[in-house]
Amino acid sequence: MTAILITGMSGVGKSTVLTELARRGHETVDTDYGDWIHVVGGEPLWREELIDNLLDRPRAGPLFVQGTVANQVRFYPRFDAVVLLTAPRDVIFHRLRTRTGNDFGKTADQLARISRDIEETEPLLRASATHELDTSGPLESVAAVLVKIAEHAGR
């Protein structure tokens, strides 16, 4: 069955759109929470056995997985689509300043790191993504596009 990776920088709305997809009845996994990630040499990485097991599980509909880690590229062949979520920097910073439930992006050092990630990491994600989606529009529209991507990828 179809598996879609949703990736992107902090503040683009990955977790928010995942929550909306779950609300619509889709199976979702946010790898930022739980035991999906471990830190190796200071670098957050997916626990490969757990991700392999997740992607091997039978499922009735599409699976939407959210995450941005250095070893995600190893799993690209296992996903039917890799969707890079993006937003203008001012939108990202506004979201980071006003979000609740996640304090990352509140300090000047963290914002500087996110700026570097946008400059250095986002182009790498863009080069390997199958789709790019600007999340500055309505949440419902972003979720609808992701569902369409899953429908087409599963054919």
What spans do the regions from the language model cover?
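Short, well-ordered alpha-helix to beta-strand connector turns
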Residues: G25, A60-G61, F79-D80, S128-A129
